[in-house]
Amino acid sequence: MEHIRVGEYEIRLMPSVVDRYFYGFARGVVDFINRSYFQAKVVGKETIPSAPFILAPTHRSNLDTLMMGSVYRPRLRYMGKDSLWKKKFAGEVLAALGGFPVARGTADREALNACVAVLKSGQPLVLFPEGTRREGDVVEDLMDGAAYIGLKTGAPIVPIGIAGSDRAMGKGVKVPHPKRCVVVIKPPISTLIDGQVASKVPRSKVNEITDELRKSMQEAYDEAKFRL
């Protein structure tokens, strides 16, 4: 089975049979909790294209990752803090759930290459373009990784706004509160240039797509907030 290397870690590129069953069970549990405990509502699922694609949600709470379990049924891939992989068992569980490690605060070339490999293998990827949890209702400057990876692979980027997750589980909160959450999905942003995957990624195009993504994420967040 093919693996991808990120730092000291080696992660399976494609899921094993056990991974698929484990992810399906875990996603079902998460979706049930989202809909029952958080009364989660998802708007715009019909706009999600065929895989591979990049889901690009706003990030106000640790719950945002779990909300993705109600957005898309098949297995998603995520980046996570490399410190979470320090314990072998935890790393195996996270890998089965679609995670792979990234060193926070560094220009991690291996992590970028891993994202490209995931998308080129036909799997969908979740990236938080804000980079870390933010506060407030304004989607400010984004990191340009989503645009770069999208251009590198031709994968469309799906802007998502999540409202209510910060009320349910803000920074420092250990036990989530049963507050309503709304997820709004906007139409995908194409990363093709003249209908083709870019042979070379132009900085101007990265900036253009990043700005378009920021505006669309803001619209999605505002709509989600309105629907709370």
Where are these regions (language model features)?
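Catalytic core of membrane glycerolipid acyltransferases/transacylases, capturing the structured
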Residues: S36, T47-T106, A114
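Non-catalytic C-terminal accessory region of glycerolipid acyltransferases
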Residues: M1-Y21, E110-L228
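Generic beta-structure capping elements
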Residues: K45, T58, K81, G105, ...
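A generic secondary-structure micro-motif detector
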Residues: D19, K41, M79-G80, R104-G105, ...
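Short, basic, glycine/proline-bearing loop/turn elements
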Residues: V29-V30, A96-V102, P129-R133
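A transmembrane-helix-recognition feature enriched in membrane-embedded lipid enzymes
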Residues: E2-V43, T47, K87-L97
